[in-house]
Amino acid sequence: MKFVDEVQIRVDAGDGGNGCVSFRREKYIPNGGPDGGDGGDGGDVYLVADENLNTLIDYRFERFHAAERGENGQSANCTGRRGKDRILRVPVGTRASDEDTGELLGDLTHHEQKLLVAKGGFHGLGNTRFKSSVNRAPRQKSNGTPGEVRTLKLELLLLADVGMLGLPNAGKSTFIRAVSAARPKVADYPFTTLVPNLGVVRGENSRSFVIADIPGLIEGAAEGAGLGIRFLKHLERCRVLIHLVDICPVDGSDPAENAVTIVRELEKYSPELASKPRWLVFNKMDLILEEEAQEVMDRVKTALNHEGPVYAITAISKEGTKKVCYDILDLLDTMPRQLAEDAKDAIEKVEFKWDDYHKNQLAKAEADALAASKAFDESLDDDEWDDEDDDGVEVIYVRD
């Protein structure tokens, strides 16, 4: 199945049902009063994380998704049925944002997590809601509000503990094949890897971690060269980065310059991502003499001003790969996963269109009824008879 990690869709929440104007009419009850019911709320649109999905390809072909409209109110104070919600299932790791405003709506980081992305319209009020002591037979009602409409940008960010960086043909896919059961394509030409690959590395005592292999970066990737930097987003949730350096490039380029290029492109994309713990791993040690290898490693460390861990491996023969994996497991044990908490803290409360509408609607109805009652009382005061102010002739009728 084709890997699709970014799509744009439109979601339409359901409109609210209209209120009803109706009066109770039964035998021997000619003036029964208002009995118009409220409409039903419109259905909401939710995203739900599903661990059985690994791509957003379904939304590449179906881009319009709408919830059900609420039913109108009916007589006998019958409330309209609420519209059915629309549930959109997406892979775990999906991030949703509003394409028009850029507002981040939420991250779905665990199975069956539910995220509201479009709120249904509020129901209209029936004429029963508008009755008062001065308005015994109200003929006003309110219509339901339209449901929220959003254009969503869905991005799939892979959930991996360790991410791999490097130039094309540095040996990233060979490394992930050596340490896990993943089988990405390996060949002797650049950009063999076109989409991210995940592998699970298992250690002793049931310890394990997930490693992500993304397509290689080249100079100018931030400006769109090669495959660009669109896949770097998959490393944002990684806790550790492995910078894989080809110690003996087949094109004769300088490994130090190549390493600096990768770090420079990483910093252009995201300084926060560049600040993550980064390990330097030199690959293809079998192609160079030990003395030359040490000199190259020293030059690369100096060029990068690297003070973190450094490893030398030969991925094709798995030499040195085991120590790298076991050291990563030890490091991850000291770095508790705080993905869900960090995501929750990073996202501010999302405001939806009709959050407080029902409060405002009822408050307005009460204010209108109060104003009408006050006006009626004032009219009674103006019509009261005052004998002291009457200078006319008093007429007295006497029965014979």
Curated annotation (Swiss-Prot):
Pfam families: GTP1_OBG (PF01018), MMR_HSR1 (PF01926). The keyword Signal does not apply. Monomer. GTP binds at residues 166-173, 191-195, 213-216, 283-286, 314-316. Mg(2+) binds at residues 173, 193. GO terms for cellular component: cytoplasm. The lineage of its organism: Bacteria, Pseudomonadati, Pseudomonadota, Gammaproteobacteria, Aeromonadales. It is found in: Cytoplasm. Residues 160-333 form the OBG-type G domain. An essential GTPase which binds GTP, GDP and possibly (p)ppGpp with moderate affinity, with high nucleotide exchange rates and a fairly low GTP hydrolysis rate. Plays a role in control of the cell cycle, stress response, ribosome biogenesis and in those bacteria that undergo differentiation, in morphogenesis control. Residues 1-159 form the Obg domain. Its main location: cytoplasm. The gene is obg. HAMAP family: GTPase_Obg. SUPFAM superfamilies: Obg GTP-binding protein N-terminal domain (SSF82051), P-loop containing nucleoside triphosphate hydrolases (SSF52540). Belongs to the TRAFAC class OBG-HflX-like GTPase superfamily. OBG GTPase family. Its cofactor is Mg(2+). Gene3D superfamilies: GTP1/OBG domain, P-loop containing nucleotide triphosphate hydrolases. Its EC number is 3.6.5.-. InterPro entries: G_OBG, GTP-bd, GTP-bd_Obg/CgtA, GTP1-OBG_CS, GTP1_OBG_dom, GTP1_OBG_dom_sf, OBG_GTPase, P-loop_NTPase. GO terms for biological process: ribosome biogenesis. It is an enzyme of class 3 (hydrolase). This is GTPase Obg. Keywords: Cytoplasm, GTP-binding, Hydrolase, Magnesium, Metal-binding, Nucleotide-binding. It comes from Aeromonas hydrophila subsp. hydrophila (strain ATCC 7966 / DSM 30187 / BCRC 13018 / CCUG 14551 / JCM 1027 / KCTC 2358 / NCIMB 9240 / NCTC 8049). PROSITE patterns: G_OBG, GTP1_OBG, OBG.
